[in-house]
UniProtKB/Swiss-Prot annotation:
Gene3D superfamilies: 1.20.1270.10, 3.30.420.40, Actin, Chain A, domain 4 (3.90.640.10), Substrate Binding Domain Of DNAk, Chain A, domain 1 (2.60.34.10). This is Chaperone protein DnaK. Induction: By stress conditions e.g. heat shock. InterPro entries: ATPase_NBD, Chaperone_DnaK, Heat_shock_70_CS, HSP70_C_sf, HSP70_peptide-bd_sf, Hsp_70_fam. It comes from Halorhodospira halophila (strain DSM 244 / SL1) (Ectothiorhodospira halophila (strain DSM 244 / SL1)). Residues 545-564, 602-647 are annotated as: Disordered. The keyword Nuclease does not apply. The lineage of its organism: Bacteria, Pseudomonadati, Pseudomonadota, Gammaproteobacteria, Chromatiales. SUPFAM superfamilies: Actin-like ATPase domain, Heat shock protein 70kD (HSP70), C-terminal subdomain, Heat shock protein 70kD (HSP70), peptide-binding domain.
């Protein structure tokens, strides 16, 4: 069985890890980094870039570079938080036919899971390159406060990326696993404060030894799925726009290119101010007017930054209070505080956490990698590599139904350990009624309209009876992923009643299948494109090295021989810019053979003897290989040069 990998699918950055024996390993991507920007860019020629290459070109292509799409996953277009993002984001956020928030790039509308799938594919291929085998299964993390729609959308993203999501795990819980797996010293209660790029969570977790098994039990969780580092960056951007307007009289708020440069500068300044007291934001040629180009040079102090984001930091404390209250604990009952998410590197955040919990947070947990490491541990548990670990997570929000008067009646309370089941018995409101519609909700508000609608469930085929007589038991079943399933039974007959779920949002199975197919086709096209580029590069190298050899050998090459080689070069030049990879490789090989013969002859003339033929043969082999050996230029002409110098 292949490895199950652990993926932290973040708003700003993503990370992948795997269990190796009893150790976890965070895997570096193709760029050599342990985290990958959660950025996907769509170029005009149809090319799709993911990660660092996508982020690098964002300044010149802001409208088609999608970042922070996790903030939209599983959300309705009409939600206030989405409407707020529409004003902030350089790319288009559009309303899908089903009312969900989708994005648009290069004229194509895409669901957020479709975009997130690109990042997951990058994580998948990063793991495959390292492991040397295909990866088909993963544990993916989500913010603890994600609702049912957001969790389902994350599973959909995994499916589109070609991954079977074995488990959805909450980010703070994953961080606690990473922290607590190898810790000795008895039972303890820890608070995980997770302030990432787009979301904030806090979980209170009890780590205990029970019959030789390490048990991680989530006591409570709380948070805000629209508060994170992106909001901190936005405060800096707004400040820079305001200062520039004051100084130059020009408003940069409507200039997408300028905004993208400001976004990068704000992120960089924020990071720098975590370790220094002051930084300068220098952006030459940020814009221009009739008088010429304008440059931005603004000093930003740590104190100023802290005053700009003070209320955002303060906003994280309320969920901490809620989580402690729900767990029945006081701040003094917490033994350790773990910080997760890049934004927790900000000194002001650390100071606030210390002030509230009355202790210094732990410094031995990497805030960028802990979540992926925890996901890999959970993957190890599921794959049987990790023994004696039990994880007991909770549902973050209450589940219930709409009852008479538009009230929400809770069936499963928030912070209930999952998997769990809750039942409610319904009846009919009218005589001979054969169907009942049940409106399922998720949230903590009293009125149904103020909570998240998960769907309407039609119970059909009820035998005609006077009103109030039929007894229909509806069971709400939350699985270990925190995703809701529903079943119903007519108590009078014992017959199971099928429920057709008409989801108020989300992707249909057909849409997911289409996206899976497109993703597979894109992966195939991407591979074909890469191989074509490699073949062209190889052809270019072969032409260059052969011409260099001809030039170096000069008079030693006869006219007929020279003409034959020039003809082979010409034939290769004719095909190398085309789309036929096989033709390019064939002509490259033909030229390589002739170049090898040329090299052999030169060596023999120089007194190289039989060694030359072995070297020439090696040259030919190298010419046929893929990217790892794109040092074709080294294989013969270097030796030719040596040969010439010895002559």
């Amino acid at each position: 069985m292949g490895k199950i990998i652990g993926i932290d699918l973040g708003t700003t950055n993503s990370c992948v890890a795997v269990m190796e024996g009893n150790k976890t390993r965070v895997i570096e991507n193709a760029e050599g980094d342990r985290t990958t920007p959660s950025v996907v860019a769509f170029a005009e020629d149809g090319e799709v870039l993911t990660g660092a290459p996508a982020k690098r070109q964002s300044v010149t292509n802001p409208e088609n570079t999608i970042h922070a799409v996790k903030r939209l996953i599983g959300r309705r277009f009409d939600e206030d938080v989405v409407q707020r993002d529409i004003k902030e984001m350089p790319y288009k956020i559009v309303k899908a036919d089903n009312g969900d928030a989708w994005v648009e790039a290069q004229g194509k509308k895409m669901a957020p899971p479709e975009v997130s799938a690109r990042t997951l594919q990058k994580m998948k291929s990063t793991a495959e390159d390292y492991l040397g085998e295909e990866v088909t299964e993963a544990v993916i993390t989500v913010p603890a406060y994600f609702n049912d729609s957001q969790r389902q959308a994350t599973k959909d993203a995994g499916k589109i990326a070609g991954l079977e999501v074995k488990r959805i795990i909450n980010e703070p819980t994953a961080a606690a696993l990473a922290y607590g797996l190898d810790k000795e010293g008895g039972d303890k209660k820890v608070a995980v404060y997770d302030l990432g790029g787009g979301t904030f969570d806090v979980s209170i977790i009890e780590i205990a030894e029970v019959d030789g098994e390490k048990q991680f039990e989530v006591l409570s969780t709380s948070g805000d799925t629209f508060l994170g580092g992106e909001d901190f960056d936005k405060r800096i951007i707004d400040y820079l726009i305001q200062e520039f307007k004051k100084d130059q009289g020009i408003d940069l708020a409507q200039d997408h290119l300028a905004l993208q440069r400001l976004r990068e500068a704000a992120e960089k300044a924020k990071v720098e101010l975590s370790s220094s007291q002051q930084t300068e934001i220098n952006l030459p040629y940020i814009t221009a007017d009739q008088s010429g180009p304008k440059h931005m040079a603004i000093k930003l102090t740590r104190a100023k930054l802290e005053s700009l984001v003070e209320d955002l930091v303060e906003r994280t404390i309320e969920p901490c209070k809620t989580a402690l209250k729900d767990a029945g604990l006081a701040a003094g009952d917490i033994q350790d505080v773990i910080l997760v998410g890049g934004q927790t590197r900000m000194p002001k955040v650390q100071e606030k956490v210390k002030e509230y919990f009355g202790q210094d947070p732990r410094k031995d947990v990497n805030p960028d990698e802990a979540v992926a490491v925890g996901a890999a541990i959970q993957a190890g548990v599921l794959g049987g590599d990790v023994k004696d670990v039990l994880l007991l997570d909770v549902t973050p929000l209450s589940l219930g139904i709409e009852t008479l008067g538009g009230v929400m009646t809770k069936i499963i309370e928030k912070n209930t350990t999952i998997p769990t089941k809750g039942t409610q018995t319904f009846s009919t409101a009218e005589d001979n009624q054969t169907a009942v519609t049940v409106h399922v909700l998720q949230g903590e508000r009293e009125m149904a309209k103020d909570n998240k609608s998960l769907g309407r469930f039609d119970l059909t085929d009820i035998p005609p009876s006077p009103r109030g007589v039929p007894q229909i038991e509806v069971a709400f079943d939350i699985d270990a992923n925190g995703i809701l399933n529903v079943s119903a039974k007519d108590k009078a007959t014992g017959k199971e009643t099928g429920i057709e779920i008409k989801a108020s949002s989300g992707l249909t199975e057909d849409e997911i299948e289409r996206m899976v197919k497109e993703a597979e086709e894109n992966a195939e096209e991407d591979r074909r494109q890469r191989e074509l580029v490699e073949a062209r590069n190889q052809a270019e190298n072969m032409i260059h090295s052969t011409r260099k050899s001809l030039s170096d050998l000069g008079e030693q090459v006869g006219d007929a021989e020279k003409q034959e080689i020039e003809s082979a070069i010409s034939e290769l030049e004719q095909v190398k810019d085309g789309e036929d990879k096989d033709a390019i490789e064939q002509k490259t090989q033909e030229l390589a053979t002739k170049a090898g013969e040329l090299a052999q002859k030169a060596y023999q003339q120089a007194g190289g003897g039989d060694e030359a033929s072995a070297d020439a043969g090696a040259g030919e082999t190298a010419s046929g290989e893929q990217k790892e050996d794109v040092v074709d230029a080294d294989f013969e002409e270097v030796k030719d040069e040596d040969g010439n110098s010895r002559k």
